[in-house]
From Swiss-Prot:
Coiled coil: none
Main location: cytoplasm
Cytoplasm listed as a keyword: yes
Gene3D superfamilies named among the record's database cross-references: Tethering factor for nuclear proteasome Cut8/Sts1
This protein's encoding gene: STS1
Domain of life of the organism encoding this protein: Eukaryota
Protein name: Tethering factor for nuclear proteasome STS1
Bias kind Basic and acidic residues: ranges: 38-51
Biased composition (Low complexity): 21-32
GO biological process, one term: protein transport
């Protein structure tokens, strides 16, 4: 009875209609999904990670920047050969004496360059001129023989050329700082002060004839002092001479020179005396005016004068 009521078996042709056909998505799936995972699969990048890490090729956020010119590597020359230095590099290797020699030789060969150099070169200052004179002075003293009598004829003959060089430089620099070439009397006085000090340091020799060159230099220096003092007295009432302490400085120079600058001292004294007289007169006039004003204010003006009686 039970076997009669059992469900009859499904015919085979019904299975053919109920079977599902594979879809397109299933056919495109990765065949590796059906296989087992291996340990090395954890270290392989996925498609998602690859897409996220890759930057677009046409992204405008970070444009390519060229390397600066200083960091670009220079290509080596295929064929190297010797060549002379450029003018700028050549001048860097020359010291002061060599450069002066080159410039002097060029001016000798091309006289028209001398005028151009004179107008182009900066005007020498007092310190630079005195430095040149001090260099000649140092060369002179270093040539004096050690030991023995340093003021003998032998010592004079050893340093005579250095004396000539110093005195020649002194005679060339001094007119440059005198009026009318030098318009500032303060600059001229400053130069004369330093140049006279250098002249004092020239040695005195036992033979009087050997001292003639130094004595002649003192005479020229005295004339230079007189010229500058007279020019300074014309400007500003000679205030530069009055308040610069030049009377004391020149008096000290004259004492060191053995009285060979006395003419310059006399000219300076006359200028200061004239200015002092004018100042005393102006002071006296000021005192008289103030005295009369005080008498007028106090009502005592004319009290000491005799009273005139009768017709005026």
């Amino acid at each position: 009875m039970n076997s009669l009521l059992a469900t009859p078996p499904v015919p085979p042709h019904f299975y053919e209609h109920c079977r599902l056909s594979p879809s397109r998505s299933m056919s495109s799936t990765n065949p590796s999904g059906n296989r087992k995972r291996k340990a090395e699969d954890d270290y392989l990048p996925s498609d998602h990670d690859t897409r996220m890490s890759a930057s677009p090729s046409n992204s405008p956020a970070f444009p390519p920047r060229p390397l600066p010119a200083s960091r670009q590597i220079k290509r080596s020359r295929p064929n190297i050969s010797g060549r002379p230095l450029s003018l700028s590099r050549l001048l860097e290797t020359l010291d002061t004496d060599a450069l002066r020699s080159v410039l002097r030789s060029m001016c000798d060969r091309h006289p028209e360059l001398a005028t151009e150099v004179v107008h182009t070169a900066p005007r020498p200052s007092v310190s630079s001129a005195l430095q040149v004179l001090n260099n000649y002075q140092s060369a002179l003293h270093s040539s004096i023989p050690l030991g023995g009598n340093s003021s003998s004829d032998y010592a004079y003959n050893r340093v005579r050329q250095h004396i000539v060089n110093l005195l020649d430089a002194l005679s060339d620099f001094t007119p440059h700082f005198l009026p009318p070439n030098e318009s500032q009397t303060s600059t001229a006085l400053s130069y004369l002060d330093g140049a006279t000090e250098i002249l004092h340091r020239l040695p005195r020799w036992d033979t009087p004839q050997n001292n003639l060159e130094k004595d002649a230099a003192y005479e020229e220096m005295a004339k230079a002092w007189i010229l500058v003092i007279r020019e300074a007295g014309k400007r500003g009432g000679g205030i530069q001479l009055q308040y610069g302490g030049w009377d004391e400085k020149l008096s000290k120079h004259n004492q060191t020179a053995g009285g060979k600058l006395q003419d310059a001292v006399d000219v300076l004294s006359s200028n200061l005396g004239w200015m002092g007289t004018n100042q005393d007169l102006s002071n006296n006039q000021g005192v008289d005016a103030s005295s009369i004003r005080q008498q007028l204010l106090s009502g005592t003006y004319g009290s000491g004068m005799p009273l005139k009686v009768g017709r005026w």
